[in-house]
From Swiss-Prot:
<dbReference type="GO" id="GO:0017124">
    <property type="term" value="F:SH3 domain binding"/>
</dbReference>
<dbReference type="GO" id="GO:0005886">
    <property type="term" value="C:plasma membrane"/>
</dbReference>
<comment type="function">
    <text>Appears to function as an adapter protein that bridges proteins together or proteins with mRNAs. May function as a ubiquitin ligase-substrate adapter. Additionally, associates with translating cytoplasmic ribosomes and may promote the expression of specific mRNAs.</text>
</comment>
<dbReference type="InterPro" id="IPR036249">
    <property type="entry name" value="Thioredoxin-like_sf"/>
</dbReference>
<keyword id="KW-1003">Cell membrane</keyword>
<dbReference type="GO" id="GO:1904690">
    <property type="term" value="P:positive regulation of cytoplasmic translational initiation"/>
</dbReference>
<dbReference type="InterPro" id="IPR051033">
    <property type="entry name" value="SH3BGR"/>
</dbReference>
<dbReference type="GO" id="GO:0043161">
    <property type="term" value="P:proteasome-mediated ubiquitin-dependent protein catabolic process"/>
</dbReference>
<comment type="similarity">
    <text>Belongs to the SH3BGR family.</text>
</comment>
<dbReference type="GO" id="GO:0005737">
    <property type="term" value="C:cytoplasm"/>
</dbReference>
<keyword id="KW-0963">Cytoplasm</keyword>
<dbReference type="InterPro" id="IPR006993">
    <property type="entry name" value="Glut_rich_SH3-bd"/>
</dbReference>
<dbReference type="GO" id="GO:1990756">
    <property type="term" value="F:ubiquitin-like ligase-substrate adaptor activity"/>
</dbReference>
<dbReference type="Pfam" id="PF04908">
    <property type="entry name" value="SH3BGR"/>
</dbReference>
<dbReference type="GO" id="GO:0005829">
    <property type="term" value="C:cytosol"/>
</dbReference>
<dbReference type="GO" id="GO:0140517">
    <property type="term" value="F:protein-RNA adaptor activity"/>
</dbReference>
<comment type="subunit">
    <text>Monomer. Interacts with PFN1/Profilin-1. Interacts with ERBB2. Interacts with ATG12. Interacts with BECN1. Interacts with translating ribosomes.</text>
</comment>
Amino acid sequence: MVIRVYIASSSGSMAIKKKQQDVLGFLEANKIGFEEKDIAANEENRKWMRENVPENSRPATGYPLPPQIFNESQYRGDYDAFFEARENNAVYAFLGLTAPPGSKEAEAQAKQQA
């Protein structure tokens, strides 16, 4: 399973750049393997992302903005969903991955199952 993060390398928006760096930095720091897919430099990436963000997750007007997160081709969410999962120590579940033993998320899951 590969986590794919759709980003825009040449975004003029500081807010988008900050959100992208936040997601990528978290994945790197936690040694979660991922691929960056640049929608600014690759039209195929842009088209695929726009077509695969579910209708109910799209903005009322315009296109979905990066970062958008997928596990293989399964949509996992945008930055706001990622941020909420991180705040709740549930990023691995959000990404569709198993939390590593000893992580806060694994401990929380063990308590829930007990």
